[in-house]
């Protein structure tokens, strides 16, 4: 039987053989829980750049234990000023699960809200050349195509940026549909 002690993040990090703990982290019900132990609250209040960087790491499969430590420490230290290494491993795992789950919910919402079905003309023109530039394109659009303002945009709350991107998409969709109406009237 595996014996799991109530250790800290630092103690776990310093272990030579983490296999029993890794197994527990991957499969034990206790470690699969998602709790807002760090009182992060609504992740849409986090800076847009933080959310986007986390989304990028999740999408690319880079959200490992070290990166979880980085993000929780970055967010938590702003609130409490304490170092993540002193945290109990179980609290850290369930707290980072909460953060990742909430970021994944935002990713799913974005997929639904911002998905654009390209036209044949857009595909023929090479729309796919913009693949991989998604986050940068969002930042650039929010900065009004002024790349010197991108860092300022990254500091804005995610909720504000999401609302603006949603508004831009609605305006784009409206103009596209309106142009189609005008185009069909001109052909009649």
Residues covered by each model-derived region:
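An amphipathic, hydrophobic-aromatic interaction surface with interspersed Lys/Arg
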Residues: 1-188
